[in-house]
Amino acid sequence: MELLKELTNTFGAEIIILPWDTNEIYGHTDGIVRFIDDDSVLMTNYAQFDPAMATRFRRILQTHFKKVYELSFKAAKPHKYSWAYINWLQTDKVLILPKFVIPEDQEAYEQISKLMLQYRNRIEMVDASDLIRYEGGLNCASWTIYVTPNQDQP
């Protein structure tokens, strides 16, 4: 508990612990859930792959957020990469969604666009087919650095 308190103080945010799905090699939450706003998060389509694990995640998230949205796709058996839309790259100016040239691309774009209203007309899709083959998404392959306005940059 001391570690959680220290993390909360350091980051100035509530720390939420999700269980590690032992079927996943890395266990990173950027492949499971994304922050939408103070009241809501978006979960990937975990329920279409592992309903029991999705329920565990959902129950934990519902104790911290008023709304837990979930991606879902019409395909009876979603493509094996469809979980990775949640692993988008987000900047202050644009949200970059991965695409995999599969039927779920458009569905993911529409669902995420409806939730990420602050990015209206500023959501782009980039082919991440090669990247996902190596078990990573756009967020995995990036590094977030906050630069304060007017700060000298290297």
Give each language-model segment a name.
Residues 1-154:
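Histidine/cysteine-enriched polar flanking segments
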